[in-house]
């Protein structure tokens, strides 16, 4: 677990008193810190003095330590060392920031694949832009530092692009129409008129080309919401009705999933007939995520899936009844507002319900943990399988990470809260503090409604990427050596004094109260916690673009493809297959 907390610096002053040099470390904080965070004694020291008649100057100190076993495993405690040269290597959070140019404005989507970033804009030209993150080889001392390279821009004709995705490089060879001698990347772009383009390009040479186009709208038909109304299924599709691609994701090598309104599509890009392999409509559908082990199991989230806000879909059941909603359902209860979900493993999935997160075990259909810490509605989730961390973002711009590596699920529902901040005070004893704030919300941005909704996040090669108002940020966890100042121990000071003044009689020890010892230990544990992380941002935040690859602009024409008329269906599961 790592924390994003305050920075501090040490300033040392010394003075001479009775030919004895003493050093005092004064801690200067940049931000406000609540005093005496740890109010309970981790170690209780009892001092006793026994008078010896033979030597009145002798002092004997007996210490009895009562250690509570439950506090020894706390991540907020560290081992106190008396070594002046004590150094530990701790994990800290490093942030790289870039201010994108004015050409990258009105961003509509962001997709990631390892170190490649694809942005789409609402402009008519240069509406696809490719970037790449690379290690900073020039400045080796910049631990975890990254450089942002602008690769190329692509102009895709047609309506505005609303969704994008990058196919993984290892799956390129599974696409029949892909030529690896010319191209090395496959992109997907979803437009506001229901079209999805399969695009091939080269990172170095460009030569972007549309391989295939998929028209979703021709497989839909119009029906009215009222059961008493006349069925309009046989009428021509209503072109004025909105049909944007709201979700687009590659699936199972050479397949992809997409969502229009409430309808879920599954396509095979190698199939000669451009009809979907699967089409069904789910009222209130917002997001789809694929099981990482079983690719035929989907998690569906939406605003009309009951209190749980999530449902499971098994594509292997061909009768259309593969949908299952976990948990008890109350027909009179209001449906949860769920906008996203993410699989953690084969049997565990997390979804958002309003301002809270729920971790489900699909084998039992029960909630195992609640993650509470957001003040706004959670609209994005990502999971780092290597570090076992969940990243969540709400509509106010708050980004949090949840460490679930040490969570042990039981029959009782666990409650997880932030480990720092106002919400970390006054929590019950059974509450797990594993949430960390990555980025706090910008109050000025929240007040400006014009910028709301322009926040995109994603996970790429263990780097958490955030895009907000043309500011791109990369968060990474790096190993950072940290010097630990030794505690102010009276025995250590007494030993140094007795070394310099051997001829003088031994000084009588001055006892400090148990409260003072507890205060020093608690402050040291808070300020130099082993898991404390430092927030670093480049200032001023200017783009660090490498001139190795100049921005390339590639325009191309759409191949002549006949547009087929069809009928639209808004809430049923069938589709019309028309021959090409």
Swiss-Prot record:
Leader sequence segment: none
Region called Disordered, residue ranges: 497-534
Keyword terms of this UniProt record: Cell cycle, Cell division, Cell wall biogenesis/degradation, Repeat, WD repeat
WD repeats: 102-141, 170-209, 222-261, 333-370, 373-412
A single BP term in Gene Ontology: cell division
Comp. bias intervals (Polar residues): 510-526
Similarity field: Belongs to the WD repeat DSE1 family.
Reported function: Involved in cell wall metabolism and required for the separation of the mother and daughter cells.
UniProt-recorded name of the protein: Protein DSE1
Organism: Kluyveromyces lactis (strain ATCC 8585 / CBS 2359 / DSM 70799 / NBRC 1267 / NRRL Y-1140 / WM37) (Yeast)
Gene behind this protein: DSE1
């Amino acid at each position: 677990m790592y924390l994003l907390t305050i920075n501090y610096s040490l300033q040392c002053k010394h003075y001479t008193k009775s030919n004895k040099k003493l050093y005092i470390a004064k801690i200067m904080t940049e931000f406000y810190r609540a005093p005496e965070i740890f109010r309970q004694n981790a170690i209780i020291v009892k001092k006793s003095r026994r008078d010896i008649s033979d030597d009145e100057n002798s002092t004997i100190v007996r210490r009895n330590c009562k250690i509570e076993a439950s506090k020894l495993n706390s991540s907020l405690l560290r081992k106190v060392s008396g070594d002046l040269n004590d150094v530990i290597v701790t994990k800290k959070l490093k942030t790289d920031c870039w201010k994108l140019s004015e050409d990258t404005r009105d961003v509509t989507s962001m997709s990631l694949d390892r170190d490649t970033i694809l942005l789409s804009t609402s402009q008519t030209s240069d509406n696809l832009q490719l970037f790449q993150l690379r290690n900073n080889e020039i400045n080796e001392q910049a631990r975890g530092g990254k450089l942002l390279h602008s690769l190329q821009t692509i102009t895709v004709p047609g309506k505005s692009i609303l969704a994008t995705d990058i196919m993984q490089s290892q799956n390129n060879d599974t696409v029949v129409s892909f030529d690896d001698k010319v191209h090395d990347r496959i992109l997907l772009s979803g437009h506001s008129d229901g079209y999805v383009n399969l695009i091939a390009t080269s990172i170095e040479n460009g030569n972007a080309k549309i391989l295939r186009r998929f028209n979703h709208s021709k497989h839909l038909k119009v029906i009215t919401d009222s059961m008493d109304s006349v069925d309009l299924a046989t009428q021509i599709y209503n072109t004025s009705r909105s049909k944007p691609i709201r979700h687009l994701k590659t699936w199972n090598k050479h397949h992809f999933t997409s969502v229009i309104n409430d309808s879920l599509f599954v396509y095979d890009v190698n199939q000669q007939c451009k009809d979907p392999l699967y089409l069904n409509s789910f009222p209130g559908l917002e997001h789809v995520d694929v099981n990482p082990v079983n690719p035929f199991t989907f998690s569906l989230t939406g605003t009309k899936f009951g209190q749980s806000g999530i449902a499971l879909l098994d594509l292997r059941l061909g009768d259309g009844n593969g949908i299952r909603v976990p948990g008890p359902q109350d027909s009179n209860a209001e449906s949860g507002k769920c906008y996203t979900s993410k699989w953690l493993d084969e049997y565990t999935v997390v979804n958002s319900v309003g301002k809270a997160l729920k971790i489900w075990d699909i084998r039992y259909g029960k909630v195992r943990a609640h993650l509470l810490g957001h003040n706004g509605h959670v609209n994005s989730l990502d999971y780092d399988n290597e570090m076992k961390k969940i990243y969540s973002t709400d509509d106010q711009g708050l980004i949090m990470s949840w460490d679930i590596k040490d969570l042990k699920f039981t029959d009782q529902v666990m409650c997880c809260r932030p480990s720092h901040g106002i919400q970390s005070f006054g929590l019950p004893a059974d509450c797990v503090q594993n949430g960390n704030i990555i980025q706090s919300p910008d109050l000025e941005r929240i007040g400006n409604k014009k910028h709301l909704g322009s926040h995109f996040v994603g996970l790429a090669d263990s780097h958490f990427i955030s895009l907000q108002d043309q500011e791109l940020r990369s968060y990474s966890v790096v190993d950072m050596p940290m010097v630990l100042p030794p505690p102010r121990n009276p025995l250590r000071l007494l030993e140094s004094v007795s070394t310099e003044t051997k001829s003088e009689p031994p000084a009588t020890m001055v006892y400090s109260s148990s409260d003072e010892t507890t205060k020093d230990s608690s402050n040291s544990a808070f300020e130099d916690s082993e898991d404390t992380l430092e927030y670093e941002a480049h200032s001023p935040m200017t783009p660090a673009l490498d001139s190795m690859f100049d921005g390339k602009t590639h325009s191309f024409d759409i191949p002549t493809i006949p547009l087929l008329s069809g009928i639209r269906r808004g809430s049923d599961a069938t589709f019309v297959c028309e021959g090409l």
